[in-house]
Curated annotation (Swiss-Prot):
High-level lineage: Viruses, Varidnaviria, Bamfordvirae, Preplasmiviricota, Tectiliviricetes
Main location: host cell
Motif (PXDLS motif, CTBP-binding): 238-242
Stated name of the protein: Early E1A protein
Bias (Acidic residues) ranges: 181-193
Length: 249
């Protein structure tokens, strides 16, 4: 406490009054006249004396020509005027051509290889615009059919057929109720034949005819518990809807 100044040992009013009277606490340096007059634009455009020739002067002038700077300044001055309408800018011819080197040219051997692959793949390729799929129904299925020729040229399979010709050739195997008789065997017994038996009113021996059953639509009688459903009702009486359902205890 002995090292502290006198104004820190008193009460708060004395301390505050001592801070106000102290000179070095609020002794800020006054700004110089040069700093008040200089602006950011002046600091940016400061010309350094002593360097008469600059090696980068030409490069800087090429990037920012004086014509563009003068046009920008004139546009800014005209825009800040009272009329509010600036002068029309003059068109400037800019070189937008790219002078960078692109990808290296391809190897001629690679071009020859790709051309050979394309020529080899041309026979297997079918242009759909030139050879369109047209449905046809010739007298003989699979012969002289334009649809079959289209599928054969596309797939490369000389035996390919269209769906219509295939159905016409194999339709009897699908839509006939009974296959055609292939002839009786040497023994003459009908059991040895592979074709199915003819459809008759009486089924063959060993085949049980299905009997249609009518589904009952009557309601199940009310029960007191679920175990009653498992027991068979000997009376099997119909449900009497005039009676009230018994209450479950």
């Amino acid at each position: 406490m002995r090292m502290l100044p006198d104004f820190f040992t008193g009460n708060w009013d004395d301390m505050f009054q001592g801070l106000l009277e102290t000179e070095y606490v609020f002794d800020f340096p006054e700004p110089s006249e040069a700093s008040e007059e200089m602006s950011l634009h002046d600091l940016f455009d400061v010309e350094v004396d002593g360097f008469e020739e600059d090696a980068n002067q030409e490069a800087v002038d090429g990037m920012f020509p004086e014509r563009l700077l003068s046009e920008a300044e004139s546009a800014a001055e005209s825009g800040s005027g009272d009329s509010g309408v600036g002068e029309e800018l003059l068109p400037v011819d800019l070189d937008l051509k790219c002078y960078e080197d692109g990808l290296p040219p391809s190897d001629p051997e690679t071009d020859e290889a790709t051309e050979a692959e394309e020529e080899a793949a041309m026979p297997t390729y079918v242009n759909e615009n030139e050879n369109e799929l047209v449905l046809d129904c010739p007298e003989n299925p699979g012969r002289g059919c334009r649809a079959c020729d289209f599928h054969r040229g596309t797939s490369g399979n000389p035996e390919a057929m269209c769906a219509l010709c295939y159905m016409r050739l194999t339709g009897h195997c699908i839509y006939s109720p009974i296959s055609d008789a292939e002839g009786e065997s040497e023994s003459g017994s009908p059991e040895d034949t592979d074709f199915p038996h003819p459809l008759t009113a009486t089924p063959p021996h060993g085949i049980v005819r299905t009997i249609p059953c009518r589904v009952s639509c009557r309601r199940r009688p009310a029960v007191e518990c679920i175990e009653d459903l498992l027991e068979e009702d000997p009376t099997d009486e119909p449900l009497n809807l005039s009676l009230k359902r018994p209450k479950c205890s």
